[in-house]
């Protein structure tokens, strides 16, 4: 009989509601129409997250959207009281690279205030909605994080996809403008980088790939990062009007979580 050990992982939750998404098929009116008449309470899923983590004596970092914090303030307080770190996911789910620097500064300021009001503590971390930052389109990004007093960022997706990410981005933590960057975990597979533990990739990855990914990242001396969303804890949540591959990315294998 051999002893089994478990390696630490970075468990993270992007705390947002079911309609917070960025796809070409969506606009303000279509999202508003989808939400009209829906009384779904996403805070039941953050409470479920607390229960799951408590069952494994685990804590997580929760990147809370300002809009969510104002809509469900008690949910954020319960996450904090349960020992989860509360960080910022910006104020709205707008794409950062579509904002001007001043717009982002104000959006970030509102988001930090909303989250800080929940805990009485200034957040130290940030993750951009849909990983929407890049050196070319948001060259001022870290200047603004540092200005706001943030210590670390988890907006780096080191694989290009049609929705986000970039080729050649570092896969290990590094500092930029005094802010620690913590990239999403990836695995080398058939000579290519492959994400496996974040959102849709976590849901779509077979168990053998998840296991290989965790082992590969751990062997490099790094803790694997897991990224989930409250909506992924309930396959029955309301749906947005998105079809095709975007709909598959957003909803495929929801029950697998």
Language model regions located:
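Surface-exposed cleft-lining segments at the edges of enzyme active sites
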Residues: 36, 127, 194-204
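Catalytic alpha-helical scaffold of carbohydrate-active enzymes acting on polysaccharides/glycoconjugates
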Residues: 1-190, 208-257
């Amino acid at each position: 009989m051999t002893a089994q050990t478990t390696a630490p992982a970075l468990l993270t939750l992007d705390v947002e509601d079911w309609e917070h998404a960025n796809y070409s098929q969506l606009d303000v009116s279509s999202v508003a129409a989808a939400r009209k008449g829906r009384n779904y309470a996403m805070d039941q899923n953050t409470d479920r997250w607390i229960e799951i983590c408590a069952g494994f004596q685990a804590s997580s970092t929760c990147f809370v959207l300002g809009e969510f914090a104002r809509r469900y303030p008690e949910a954020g307080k319960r996450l904090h009281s349960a020992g989860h770190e509360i960080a910022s996911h910006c104020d709205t789910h707008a794409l950062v690279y579509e904002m001007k620097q001043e717009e982002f500064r104000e959006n970030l300021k509102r988001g930090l205030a909303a989250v800080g009001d929940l805990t009485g503590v200034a957040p130290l971390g940030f993750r951009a909605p849909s990983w929407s930052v890049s050196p070319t389109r948001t060259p001022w990004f870290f200047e603004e994080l540092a200005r706001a007093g943030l210590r670390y960022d988890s907006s780096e997706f080191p694989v290009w996809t049609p929705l986000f990410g970039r080729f050649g981005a570092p896969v290990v933590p590094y500092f930029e403008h005094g802010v620690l960057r913590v990239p999403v975990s990836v695995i080398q597979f058939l000579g290519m980088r492959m994400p496996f533990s974040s959102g849709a990739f976590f849901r779509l990855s077979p168990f053998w790939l998840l296991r290989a990914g965790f082992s590969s990242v751990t062997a490099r001396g790094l803790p694997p990062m897991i990224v989930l969303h409250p909506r992924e804890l309930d396959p029955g949540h309301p749906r947005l009007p998105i079809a095709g591959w975007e709909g598959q990315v957003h909803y495929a294998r929801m029950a697998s979580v």
